[in-house]
């Protein structure tokens, strides 16, 4: 049925191959074959095992015939080891061969103990009809035999070696051609390399590792999995420690930042359409901000954070009413089934406000009004076990879920306390800001009391609340929208009540006013009808664009032989604000940056800062003067502002990028 290849291992002789014949060269004449009955189990081994000799021989008792000249079992499949008939033939032939060799050993008085000590491992490989005609069988056998001495050298010295049973090794190789030599021996010619398949045995496969060579195919090896450290955050860090109980390390992390009053892992529902729950590391600080991170590592590195401002938010628990003692001015949701979204979208509705000083013991519990759909909502409340929601004033909702009821209630109580503390601090800071802004309010009131500022500069609407900074005028809200469409080059719009007003801006507004501005911008109106409060927006826009964009009503320049730039220099030196505004309205950027003709190289900005006039300095900057310009001595306007001790001019110049020589 097939031939038998016997592999023997000698512990004292190195592995040798015959390069010319292409087969393993034996160093001794003995051939030792052992079956399952003859193995010497428990035989002691030497402490140091040397590389072994491996001999591969083809038995002569069973000669190899060509597959076409031999009788094959009808039910024989590709793998003979899986066929009962092939296994029976193999067992009969191999057992007969072993019995004959054993009888020969007894006749010649050959001791098996000698072989058990001399040879460390013996195994018989059966070559059936399917494996005998496949490629590169020689190299496959060599690769297997190379594994044996390497395995012996790597074994524990205290481990005893037992000769394994005869095993059926099936090789999944391509094709091999066997030729007959003149001396009766068999030689194998290989044509393609292959990888041996796993032997069909019940014993556990040993882990072999053969050094790769050019002529040896890669064997199938079992190697232990190694964890890669390519993506570890820090050198020497253990990624397993970061995954274990991050709550236990909460008190030892976050140095250099505000220590959270509460922190831990919570589940957060994503806002996408999938609505998946992901773990987040959530921190609550005393500044009224709830921050969540993707992991504890991100919190330690202070990256990938998202914050929720609790001052403008409220917390809701499904199936529970909020505690009135811990919430201040919290809107109460209606009993409609729509829930949070409708309440936040409207932004209106009933709300109950309580003083922060009222304690929970003085206020009775509020029972929710009976709802006709209460029975329908019971199953919905059961689904939301440990989750809570944070809803902002804009309607944005964050869903969180804790592991237990107690943990959820602790988070809810802590967040409610921070909401109340944020509202209280907001009230105290607002009162402080009111005290500090009294001077600003008085200054703004003085601007409104100026001549002509009681009406809109363009349509005469009463009590205007909007201003144009570079024009120095007040206007109504409708005209302010038209001024915004002109662009900041022509009009810089700002609200009297909503925006901040620094000192230099208040001085500009209090120095010009509507009457002075209209005397310049409407100096040549030629009797045209000015729009009124009842005029349409189109009429107001037509008037405003003709007045400021086309400059149709602008007063004419004074008759003089000086250029506009020189006139501007003189008006700045004389601090003539009305003439300077007229010249700026008529002039271009080049004319505004004209220097004095006396050789000192000063611009109008240098002269304004030398005088310490912040109004002229600010107007010149808005109309395009170069703040980086230097005079003949290399001085900037900031140098003259420092000489004049004008802090307002210094602030304006630094704000617009004037180089500071003192830094």
From Swiss-Prot:
<dbReference type="Pfam" id="PF01412">
    <property type="entry name" value="ArfGap"/>
</dbReference>
<dbReference type="InterPro" id="IPR002110">
    <property type="entry name" value="Ankyrin_rpt"/>
</dbReference>
<feature type="compositionally biased region" description="Polar residues">
    <location>
        <begin position="203"/>
        <end position="216"/>
    </location>
</feature>
<protein>
    <recommendedName>
        <fullName>Putative Arf-GAP with GTPase, ANK repeat and PH domain-containing protein 7</fullName>
    </recommendedName>
</protein>
<keyword id="KW-0479">Metal-binding</keyword>
<dbReference type="InterPro" id="IPR036770">
    <property type="entry name" value="Ankyrin_rpt-contain_sf"/>
</dbReference>
<dbReference type="InterPro" id="IPR001164">
    <property type="entry name" value="ArfGAP_dom"/>
</dbReference>
<dbReference type="GO" id="GO:0005096">
    <property type="term" value="F:GTPase activator activity"/>
</dbReference>
<comment type="similarity">
    <text>Belongs to the centaurin gamma-like family.</text>
</comment>
<feature type="domain" description="Arf-GAP">
    <location>
        <begin position="441"/>
        <end position="561"/>
    </location>
</feature>
<feature type="domain" description="PH">
    <location>
        <begin position="259"/>
        <end position="420"/>
    </location>
</feature>
<feature type="repeat" description="ANK 2">
    <location>
        <begin position="633"/>
        <end position="662"/>
    </location>
</feature>
<feature type="repeat" description="ANK 1">
    <location>
        <begin position="600"/>
        <end position="629"/>
    </location>
</feature>
<dbReference type="InterPro" id="IPR001849">
    <property type="entry name" value="PH_domain"/>
</dbReference>
<keyword id="KW-0040">ANK repeat</keyword>
<dbReference type="Pfam" id="PF00169">
    <property type="entry name" value="PH"/>
</dbReference>
<comment type="function">
    <text>Putative GTPase-activating protein.</text>
</comment>
<keyword id="KW-0863">Zinc-finger</keyword>
<dbReference type="InterPro" id="IPR038508">
    <property type="entry name" value="ArfGAP_dom_sf"/>
</dbReference>
<dbReference type="InterPro" id="IPR051282">
    <property type="entry name" value="Arf-GAP_GTPase_ANK_PH"/>
</dbReference>
<keyword id="KW-0677">Repeat</keyword>
<keyword id="KW-0343">GTPase activation</keyword>
<dbReference type="InterPro" id="IPR037278">
    <property type="entry name" value="ARFGAP/RecO"/>
</dbReference>
<dbReference type="GO" id="GO:0008270">
    <property type="term" value="F:zinc ion binding"/>
</dbReference>
<dbReference type="InterPro" id="IPR011993">
    <property type="entry name" value="PH-like_dom_sf"/>
</dbReference>
<feature type="compositionally biased region" description="Low complexity">
    <location>
        <begin position="188"/>
        <end position="202"/>
    </location>
</feature>
<feature type="region of interest" description="Disordered">
    <location>
        <begin position="231"/>
        <end position="255"/>
    </location>
</feature>
<dbReference type="Pfam" id="PF12796">
    <property type="entry name" value="Ank_2"/>
</dbReference>
<dbReference type="GO" id="GO:0003924">
    <property type="term" value="F:GTPase activity"/>
</dbReference>
<feature type="region of interest" description="Disordered">
    <location>
        <begin position="182"/>
        <end position="216"/>
    </location>
</feature>
<feature type="compositionally biased region" description="Basic and acidic residues">
    <location>
        <begin position="235"/>
        <end position="250"/>
    </location>
</feature>
<keyword id="KW-0862">Zinc</keyword>
<feature type="zinc finger region" description="C4-type">
    <location>
        <begin position="456"/>
        <end position="479"/>
    </location>
</feature>
């Amino acid at each position: 049925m097939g031939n038998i290849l016997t592999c023997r291992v000698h512990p004292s002789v190195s592995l040798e191959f015959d390069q010319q014949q292409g087969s393993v060269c034996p160093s001794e004449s003995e051939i030792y074959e052992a079956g399952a009955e003859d193995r010497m189990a428990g035989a002691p081994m030497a402490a140091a095992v040397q590389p072994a000799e491996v001999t591969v021989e083809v038995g002569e008792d069973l000669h190899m015939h060509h597959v076409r000249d031999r009788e094959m079992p009808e039910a024989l499949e590709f793998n003979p080891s899986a066929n009962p008939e092939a296994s029976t033939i193999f067992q009969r032939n191999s057992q007969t061969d072993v019995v004959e060799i054993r009888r020969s050993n007894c006749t010649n008085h050959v001791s098996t103990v000698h072989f058990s000590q001399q040879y460390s491992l013996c195994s018989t490989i059966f070559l059936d009809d399917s494996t005998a005609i496949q490629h590169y069988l020689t190299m496959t056998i060599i690769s297997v035999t190379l594994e044996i001495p390497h395995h012996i050298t790597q074994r524990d010295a205290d481990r005893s070696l037992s000769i394994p049973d005869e095993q059926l090794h099936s090789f999944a190789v391509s094709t091999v051609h066997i030729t007959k030599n003149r001396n009766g021996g068999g030689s194998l010619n290989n044509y393609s390399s292959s990888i041996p398949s796993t032997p069909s045995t019940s014993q556990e496969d040993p882990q072999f590792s053969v050094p790769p060579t050019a002529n040896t195919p890669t064997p199938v090896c079992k190697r232990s999995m190694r964890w890669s450290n390519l993506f570890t955050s820090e050198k020497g860090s253990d990624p397993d420690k970061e995954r274990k109980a991050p709550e236990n390390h909460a008190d030892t992390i976050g140095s250099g930042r505000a220590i959270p009053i509460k922190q831990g892992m919570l589940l957060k529902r994503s806002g996408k359409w999938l609505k998946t729950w992901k773990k987040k590391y959530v921190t609550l600080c005393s500044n009224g901000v709830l921050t969540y991170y993707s992991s504890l590592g991100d919190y330690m590195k202070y990256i990938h954070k998202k914050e929720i401002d609790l001052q403008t938010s409220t917390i809701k628990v499904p199936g529970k009413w909020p505690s009135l003692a811990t919430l201040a001015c919290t809107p109460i949701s209606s009993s409609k089934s729509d829930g949070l979204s409708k309440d936040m979208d409207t932004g209106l509705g009933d709300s109950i406000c309580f003083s922060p000083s009222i304690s929970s013991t003085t206020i009775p519990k509020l029972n929710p009004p009976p709802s006709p759909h209460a029975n329908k909502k019971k199953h919905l409340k059961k689904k939301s076990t440990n989750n809570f929601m944070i809803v902002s004033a804009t309607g944005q909702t964050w869903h969180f879920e804790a592991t237990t009821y107690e943990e959820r209630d602790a988070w809810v109580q802590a967040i409610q306390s921070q909401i109340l503390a944020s509202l209280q601090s907001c009230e105290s800071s607002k009162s402080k800001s009111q005290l500090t802004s009294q001077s600003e309010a008085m200054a703004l009131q003085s601007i409104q009391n100026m001549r002509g500022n009681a009406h809109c500069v363009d349509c005469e609407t009463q009590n205007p609340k909007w201003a144009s900074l570079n024009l120095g005028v007040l206007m109504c809200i409708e005209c302010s929208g038209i001024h915004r469409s002109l662009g900041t080059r022509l009009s810089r719009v700002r609200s009297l009540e909503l925006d901040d007003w620094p000192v230099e801006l208040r001085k500009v507004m209090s120095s010009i006013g509507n009457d002075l501005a209209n005397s310049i911008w409407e100096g040549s109106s030629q009797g045209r009808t000015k729009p009124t409060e009842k005029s349409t927006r189109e009429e107001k826009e037509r008037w405003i664009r003709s007045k400021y964009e086309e400059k149709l009503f602008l007063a004419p320049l004074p008759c003089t032989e000086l250029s506009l730039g020189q006139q501007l220099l003189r008006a700045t030196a004389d601090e003539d604000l009305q003439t300077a505004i007229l010249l700026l309205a008529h002039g271009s950027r080049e004319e505004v940056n004209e220097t004095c003709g006396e050789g000192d190289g000063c611009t109008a900005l240098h002269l304004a800062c030398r005088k310490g006039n912040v109004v002229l300095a600010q107007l010149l900057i808005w109309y395009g003067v170069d703040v980086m310009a230097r005079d003949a001595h290399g001085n900037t306007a900031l140098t003259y502002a420092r000489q004049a001790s004008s802090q307002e001019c210094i602030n304006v110049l630094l704000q617009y990028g004037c180089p500071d020589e003192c830094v």
